[in-house]
Amino acid sequence: MLPSGAPFARAVRIDSIGDDMKFAFVFPGQGSQSVGMLNAFADLAVVRETLQEASDALNQDLGKLIAEGPAEELNLTTNTQPVMLTAAYACYRAWQEAGGPAPSIVAGHSLGEYTALVAAGAIAFKDAVPLVRFRAQAMQTAVPVGQGGMAAILGLDDDTVRAVCAEAAEAGVVEAVNFNAPAQVVIAGNKAAVEKACEIAKAKGAKRALPLPVSAPFHSSLLTPASDQLRDYLATVDVKAPQIPVVNNIDVAVVSDPAAIKDALVRQAAGPVRWVECVRHIAGTGVTHVIECGPGKVLAGLTKRIDANLTGASVFDPASLDEALKLATA
């Protein structure tokens, strides 16, 4: 552990970064949180400052919640969304503090898109924290608890999963909502329709059809009421043109106009996360290294499955930060 307030030791020199290297940063969404996930960074001043800024923005001690839990409270979506934004941004600031190279492009998975916009300078962190708290509340209230569901379908291609959803639609709304990796698609909708889709997927040869422990059918059209509320809230938020290109989830596009950024966030709440396409877009810009900032290492694993030519790493504690920085001199 570092002495309280001590500067973080640089693992590499900035001027040693290879000229042929180009970095992208990606930020995780819900599901990667865990009690104690920032404890290894506890003595890093910039991490403590980030936690304090978030706590001040919500008038809630997020640092204590992250460090001590309980898990049941941490996993409430109204807490998870601001907590994951805060944790991922803290890891990004730790990278900056350590002298890591700046990204040439950024993206985030679902909630992580908000972290990407903060990292790119489009939304102030102090504004983003209450914004994602509101987003969480709107998403949770759009569909009563117990009426919606989500499931991961493994082993079927995208078109087959879409066909499965169409066949199961007689039982209610069910849609493909997260395209996370080749042959890894998440579906969401009415609980009965999701269960029906899982049965059909298995009959069509899916390796697995796993119900997910979530409180709402995130990114499905059932969350349109949440999108409407989010549009009204975003009208009050100051959004600037990003200083770094941000690839959005809903269109797999880089936009700089603040109104277009807000519109993409509104549609994203009730629309699909096209993560495979986002990573391929990033690769198409000449990026060589994709660094995931935040706990869980989920996106680093997906990156390798999407494009084996990309070098991936995660930053979630001092040891992983050192390893990621060493990639810059490899």
Give the positions of each predicted feature.
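Short, Lys/Arg-enriched N-terminal segments with co-localized hydrophobic residues
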Residues: 7-20
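A short, acidic, amphipathic alpha-helical segment used as a generic capping/interface helix at domain edges
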Residues: 271-287
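Short, charged, surface-exposed secondary-structure boundary motifs
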Residues: 321-327
